[in-house]
């Protein structure tokens, strides 16, 4: 049987823990055929590990999209988009491609960085991506920006933000709480317009978790492409990334990536799902 084809529109992380590299590793683990339209290249200073983001020329970006659309993706995922023009184009491409699913990972900062890459991108995401997305996967910071509610510090805050984001047009909202809400458990909140669900796993090591957000969104996309419902895909992706985080490893003195192969090679983590 032919593999489902999945396109990631994302940046390249030269350290290969996040970005399109994380997406392709995840796609391979979950039996979908991954394609890439590159938006930018992220490099790191070898002394400080500060990030430098170099955008891809728009003409080259368009040629990548033409190639990918001609192949015919079943699902599309976005990661670091970088500019408002690329954000708008990503939304248009989903419609043009005829893909069944559109997963938006609303990347706003690089791991370890504090400043939003481009403040104007938030409004562009709200206008061009959220109304078309099947699933949106913000972390607490990104959910606070997309909802306009600012800092989120509790499950109740997450519920309010999820409702606001849902009202902007995305039928499935999953907010990643991660380590911010509790030291012993990892809590995410999923909302489908009808019911809120809390997804819980044990809290694993957090020193080596580079690429966790990209991996979660990529896994969600792969599971959707292979036939799971949005709720099933999100729960399965939570289990996949939990295994990857638990088995993260030290790359150098600055960073350590998650282990994208841990779910298939080492262990599968149980996810507790409760209505809240």
UniProtKB/Swiss-Prot annotation:
EC class of the enzyme, as a word: transferase
InterPro entries reported for this sequence: HMP/HMP-P_kinase_dom, PM/HMP-P_kinase-1, Ribokinase-like
Residue sites binding ATP per the record: 139, 176-180, 188, 213, 238
Listed GO CC annotations: cytosol
SUPFAM superfamilies named among the record's database cross-references: Ribokinase-like
Database matches in Pfam families: Phos_pyr_kin
Signal peptide (residue range): none
Entry annotated with the keyword DNA-binding: no
Domain of life, source organism: Bacteria
Similarity remark: Belongs to the ThiD family.
Protein's name according to its UniProt entry: Putative pyridoxine kinase
Species per Swiss-Prot/TrEMBL record: Staphylococcus epidermidis (strain ATCC 35984 / DSM 28319 / BCRC 17069 / CCUG 31568 / BM 3577 / RP62A)
